[in-house]
Amino acid sequence: MNWLLRKCSKCGRYTLSRDRCPYCGGELIVPHPPRFSPIDKYVEYRLEEKLSKGIIKLDEKPPYKP
């Protein structure tokens, strides 16, 4: 999808320019989040990455006890 709005990574201002920020000359990024899909093709890769970095640990007991 072709987004028009851009955000400067340096100063945080929004602009319609596509190359550089007209205020500070910083790099522009697309501020829109990625589309959500219930059929996620990359969930396995994200889970594997989080497990390898130790963000998620599957061997721990959950804190909730019914």
Swiss-Prot record:
Source domain of life: Archaea
GO cellular component: ribonucleoprotein complex
Gene3D superfamilies: H/ACA ribonucleoprotein complex, subunit Nop10
A Pfam family that the UniProt record links to this protein: Nop10p
The keyword Zinc appears for this protein: no
Alphabetical UniProt keywords: Ribonucleoprotein, Ribosome biogenesis, rRNA processing
Keyword rRNA processing: yes
GO biological process, one term: pseudouridine synthesis
GO molecular function, one term: snoRNA binding
InterPro entries tied to this protein: H/ACA_rnp_Nop10 (IPR007264), H/ACA_rnp_Nop10_sf (IPR036756), Nop10_arc-typ (IPR023532)
Family classification: Belongs to the NOP10 family.
Role description: Involved in ribosome biogenesis; more specifically in 18S rRNA pseudouridylation and in cleavage of pre-rRNA.
The protein, known as: Ribosome biogenesis protein Nop10
